[in-house]
């Protein structure tokens, strides 16, 4: 029994340590990626894009006879849950604006669509920044994603609304027969599950990189839970505060801005959570090696795949044991320096002849040996640190030796690796 207790204490201590370290990394990444500033920027963009998005939604509903009138009902339902205390006033304002927008000319409609597109583009850029992706979607893939959000999104939301309405009607009809309150529980769980699914799709589909669905789903559930908690707390504060006493009818404006900012903060926090979770899950001993070793391991894989006429996916590199975020950072670097190229399917192929590329080029790309920027500091540091000049000389010698040692081509390096493996194979 005592041994069991000790084992449990050790395990709980280890779990607490992991959770503490994870929380520290989560808050660090949230601040490092400037998520709070991004939330403020997206709040500002939302003010301009919300009416265009609603206009597109109404247009989609009007084009489908089965959903006739659903737009207004859906609008009321969303804002009832969206902002408990001021949702009715905000909903009325936005509905009026959207009704006026539907009477715009062709040029006005184009401007509304451009505004909605820019918001979606800004959201993708923010998510790419969180995942360390520098290259946004371009061409057909980006257009299809945004069009899917603007066209299919409202239909899915309408389907969710109809499902919720159906469950509510079933709950009312079976109220006397449902002694255990099962339908009431289902009616409460389904909207939360749909919210979780929406966040999951947002985390998985928006970034221009492969996000494991498992971690996206976990992040979606956690984010939906945080959303419900913050919504309840916000509603309680609004209901028991003196905002309306101070601002009067104008109180809806600061409250709406505050809520939108909180909403984007929760969403971006969820995206950072998914990224941090994925990095922790894929982390291994190899991911703690230097950038240069990781690049060489990846280039060796690209060489093998190129010999077979195949491309390399994100999953292929992650399976090597490299951290997901570490790989994405090195991938962006290799694409930027044209070591690899992106295919139309989103995979990657080798774009350089490894017989004409040497190890030193890789070392220079990842800034592995020494930094030439230190030489520019000679005058500033030498006066305060007499040893700095001697250090620069030794550093220069190290660089020359490293450059000479790394002059071998990458093809020779990888070919030598296979030659060393052959005797071992013959012996077996």
Swiss-Prot record:
Topological relation to the membrane, as annotated: Multi-pass membrane protein
Record field: transmembrane: 47-67, 104-124, 143-163, 189-209, 218-238, 248-268, 292-312
NCBIfam families, alphabetized: yihY_not_rbn
PANTHER family attached to this UniProt entry: INNER MEMBRANE PROTEIN YHJD, UPF0761 MEMBRANE PROTEIN YIHY
GO cellular component: plasma membrane
Main location: membrane
Pfam families from the UniProt entry: Virul_fac_BrkB
Subcellular location(s) of the protein: Cell inner membrane
Family to which this protein belongs: Belongs to the UPF0761 family.
Keywords: Cell inner membrane, Cell membrane, Membrane, Transmembrane, Transmembrane helix
Protein name, per record: UPF0761 membrane protein TERTU_3006
């Amino acid at each position: 029994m005592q041994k069991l207790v000790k084992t449990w204490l050790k395990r709980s201590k280890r779990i607490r340590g992991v959770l503490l370290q994870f929380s520290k990394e989560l808050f660090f990444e949230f601040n490092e990626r400037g998520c709070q500033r991004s939330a403020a920027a997206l709040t500002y963009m939302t003010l301009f894009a919300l009416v265009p998005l609603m206009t597109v939604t109404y247009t989609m509903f009007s084009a489908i006879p089965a959903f006739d009138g659903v737009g207004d009902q859906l609008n009321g339902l969303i804002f009832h849950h969206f902002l408990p205390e001021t949702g009715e006033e905000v909903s009325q304002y936005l509905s009026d604006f959207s009704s006026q927008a539907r009477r715009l000319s062709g040029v006005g409609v184009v401007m509304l669509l451009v505004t909605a597109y820019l918001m979606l583009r800004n959201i993708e850029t923010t998510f790419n920044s969180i995942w360390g992706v520098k290259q946004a979607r371009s061409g057909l893939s980006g257009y299809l994603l945004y069009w899917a959000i603007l066209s299919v999104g409202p239909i899915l939301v309408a389907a969710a609304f109809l499902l919720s309405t159906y469950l509510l009607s079933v709950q009312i009809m079976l109220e006397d027969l449902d002694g255990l309150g099962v339908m009431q529980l289902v009616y409460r769980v389904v909207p939360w599950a749909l919210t979780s699914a929406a966040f999951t799709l947002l985390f998985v589909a928006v970034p221009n990189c492969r996000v494991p669905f498992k971690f996206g789903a976990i992040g979606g559930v956690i984010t939906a839970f945080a959303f419900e908690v913050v919504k309840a707390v916000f509603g309680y504060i609004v209901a028991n505060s003196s905002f309306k006493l101070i601002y009067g009818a104008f109180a809806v404006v600061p409250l709406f801005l505050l809520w939108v900012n909180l909403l984007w903060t929760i969403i971006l926090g969820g995206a950072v959570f998914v990224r941090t979770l994925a990095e922790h899950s894929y982390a291994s001993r190899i991911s703690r090696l230097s950038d240069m070793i990781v690049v060489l391991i990846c280039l060796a894989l690209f060489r093998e795949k190129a010999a077979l006429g195949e491309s390399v996916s994100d999953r292929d590199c992650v399976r090597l044991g490299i951290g997901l975020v570490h790989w994405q950072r090195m991938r962006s670097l290799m694409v930027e320096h044209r070591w690899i190229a992106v295919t139309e399917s989103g995979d990657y192929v080798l774009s350089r002849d490894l017989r004409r590329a040497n190890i030193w080029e890789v070392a220079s790309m990842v800034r592995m040996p020494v930094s030439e920027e230190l030489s520019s500091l000679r005058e500033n540091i030498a006066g305060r640190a007499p040893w700095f000049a001697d250090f620069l000389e030794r550093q220069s010698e190290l660089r020359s030796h490293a450059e000479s040692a790394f002059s071998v081509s990458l093809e020779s390096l990888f070919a030598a690796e296979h030659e060393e493996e052959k005797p071992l194979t013959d012996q077996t």
